[in-house]
Amino acid sequence: MVDVRDAAALTALVADVEPDEVYNLAAVSSVGRSWQEPELTVAVNQTAVEVLVAALRAQQARTGREVRLFQASSAEISGDATASPYARSKAAAEEVVRDAREHGLAASVGRLYIHESPLRGAAFVSRKITRGAAEIALGMRERLVLGKLDVVRDWGFAGDYVEAIRLMVAADEPLDLPIGTGRPHRLLDLVDRAFAAAGLGEAAPYVDQDPSLVRPADTAVLVADPAPAERALGWRATTTFEEVVDAMVAVDLARLRTGVEESTTYLSRPARSAHPRG
């Protein structure tokens, strides 16, 4: 393990391992946190990518063996690339990777739309919602306070997106692709589904809105076009929005009932539901 902000350590790790494939998912991945810690965001999301790319190019020149890189980018760039420190850092990293590709590195960029699973960090709004619904269902709290509920996003299952990433790296040529479901949902839809999955019915009686929680410069709509990935990879997301939210709520209920926050049983693929894709 290495701190990607440590350029010497990261460079030494690459030289020691001499990888055939690198999947760079390291990031300050919270837009909200990027406003609070913009310097950290640049160091991890942009500068570390510059160091990694330089190390991989040096390895390739030294060994004469191709190395392939997948760089995880973000749907936030598809909105306003200057809207947040996070978006700016990811846009800059994309340029670093494309430049390296022009100089012979087999580097692909995947613009990942929101990808969820029961392992989502507690600081993210999706987990705040599923955890809150679970806590209310178990009588551990009475209300959930949220910000803006009418933003529209493309929520998918992380496991589906990992398959797309694998296919991108295995492709004959480096690719730049959006990775998402193409199915829009409001944040309110996620709230309603989570409360229904927790057995509470309508969410409205339990939810308050606080304007102070609205993020600055939040893009109203971010939804992927899944067609490029389907054409290039034969890939399309197979897990529905409802299945993902249901799985997250089920695991949060299990966490609260057992006191076990992390378990390999939480890694299971969401169960198929009878709900249509939507």
What name fits each language-model region?
Residues 161, 165, 179, 190, ...:
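Non-catalytic, hydrophobic alpha-helical segments
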Residues 85-87, 91, 95-154, 158-169, ...:
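NAD(P)-dependent short-chain dehydrogenase/reductase
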